[in-house]
């Protein structure tokens, strides 16, 4: 395996090159600072961009790391010249050299919700568009979170100012507040990509794995929410239960098996909004005549979800996460399984819900759920909670008759 890396004298390269070399990859390093390359990596072939043709022979993939980063000074033109103009030249050289694969290190800043906020973000979004329009190679676009390894840079560098014993804990806390990416995980992803050359766009983060700061805060929010609702709104729960019982035949609370974390089934509790003996199917598969009169109001106001505080207390669900589906929704289950969505607990509300993506489009829903997992942070959890509370997302819709 032979990988040509641009921007090889930069921070991200310095954190992943040891992992790539330890895995047996042969590296060709390119940078404007050739002296730094030869000083740090004397065992690797290296040169500047003018030496590309002589260095590119036998290369399997190009990893384009060269960029003007978001902590650098400069105007829009300066960022565009480096992050788009240089990429265009690298793409041309890659094609000319007959290299079959290009791996582009983009950024979470290039996502649509942030791309208008800085010259860096705008240039990274333009770079992705350039590749989508002009790259005919096997193309991997990786939107990276803040990368960390044996060293820290950017906003994470604040950790290095504290005593060594407390640094790991602070790094976990910062990771709970914004997505981060361990260098080893990035290196492993690159190695897998070179072994499997195909086109893909992917968000790369640690996904809050092994982050006790995020896990404890998220679980704490679940328990506080469940306890608050139970203590303050027990009377509303009792009134709604009685109203459902009196206005239609059937139980007040509907207990239904759903697919939970790791694909394990659990019983999900909701106020019944459907008529008795309605078939077990996704809401989008049912007609609106299946919904009771009071059920329409409960679904619109989301009050039907209140009994799910039981699931929060039991740990079956979280306040925020992918909405749990039925065991019969095989297409959605398999799509979620393939994207790792089943690795986390399902939620009462989620990113897909406030985006109005429901179970009628299983592949799109699974992809959106996977994006949520990659982007998870405490601020995002709070953003989804606020959006849900203010009326965003109305859940799965029934079919018109």
Question: Residue locations for each model-derived region?
Answer:
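Conserved Rossmann-fold NAD(P)-dependent oxidoreductase catalytic core, especially the SDR/UDP-sugar
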Residues: 88-122, 140
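NAD(P)H-binding glycine-rich loop region in Rossmannoid oxidoreductase-like domains
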Residues: 43-85, 89, 93, 109-113
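N-terminal Rossmann NAD(P)H-binding glycine-rich loop of SDR-like oxidoreductase domains
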Residues: 3-23
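A hydrophobic, helix-centered structural microdomain
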Residues: 210-276, 384-401
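A short, structured surface patch at a secondary-structure boundary
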Residues: 285-344
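Conserved beta-loop-beta element that borders a ligand/cofactor-binding pocket
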Residues: 132-152, 199
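NAD(P)-dependent short-chain dehydrogenase/reductase
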Residues: 145-178
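C-terminal terminal-structure detector
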Residues: 341-401
């Amino acid at each position: 395996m032979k990988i040509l890396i641009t921007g090889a004298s930069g921070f991200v390269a310095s954190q992943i090159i040891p992992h790539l070399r330890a895995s047996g990859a042969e590296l060709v390093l390119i940078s404007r600072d050739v002296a730094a390359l030869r000083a740090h990596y004397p065992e690797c072939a290296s040169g500047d961009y003018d030496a590309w043709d002589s260095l590119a022979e036998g290369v399997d993939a190009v990893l384009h790391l060269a960029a003007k980063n978001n902590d650098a000074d400069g105007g829009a033109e300066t960022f565009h010249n480096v992050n788009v103009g240089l990429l265009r030249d690298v793409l041309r050289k890659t094609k000319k050299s007959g290299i079959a694969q290009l791996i582009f290190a983009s950024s979470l800043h290039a996502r649509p919700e942030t791309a208008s906020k800085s010259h860096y973000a705008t240039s990274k979004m333009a770079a992705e568009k350039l590749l989508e329009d002009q790259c005919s190679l096997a193309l991997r676009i990786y939107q990276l979170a803040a990368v960390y390894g044996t060293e820290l840079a950017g906003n994470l560098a604040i950790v290095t100012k504290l005593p060594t014993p407390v640094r790991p804990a602070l790094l976990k806390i910062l990771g709970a507040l914004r997505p981060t990416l361990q260098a080893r995980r990035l290196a492993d992803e690159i190695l897998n990509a070179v072994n499997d050359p195909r086109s893909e766009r992917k968000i790369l983060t640690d996904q809050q794995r092994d982050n006790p700061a995020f896990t404890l805060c998220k679980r704490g929010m679940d328990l506080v929410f469940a306890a608050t609702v139970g203590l303050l709104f027990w009377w509303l729960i009792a009134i709604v239960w009685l109203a459902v019982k009196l206005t239609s035949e059937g139980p007040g609370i509907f207990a239904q098996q759903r697919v939970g974390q790791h694909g394990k089934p659990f019983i999900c509790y909701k106020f019944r909004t459907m008529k008795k003996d309605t078939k077990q199917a996704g809401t989008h598969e049912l007609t609106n005549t299946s919904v009771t009169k009071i059920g329409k109001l409960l679904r619109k106001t989301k009050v039907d979800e209140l009994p799910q505080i039981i699931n929060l207390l039991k740990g079956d669900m979280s306040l925020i996460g992918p909405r749990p589906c039925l065991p019969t929704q095989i297409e959605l289950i398999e799509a979620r399984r393939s994207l790792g969505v089943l690795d986390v607990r399902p939620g009462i509300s989620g990113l897909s819900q406030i985006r109005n993506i429901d179970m009628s489009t299983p592949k799109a829903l699974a992809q959106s759920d996977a994006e949520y997992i990659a982007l998870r942070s405490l601020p995002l959890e709070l953003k989804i909670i606020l959006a849900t509370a203010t009326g965003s997302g109305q859940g799965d819709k029934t079919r018109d008759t």
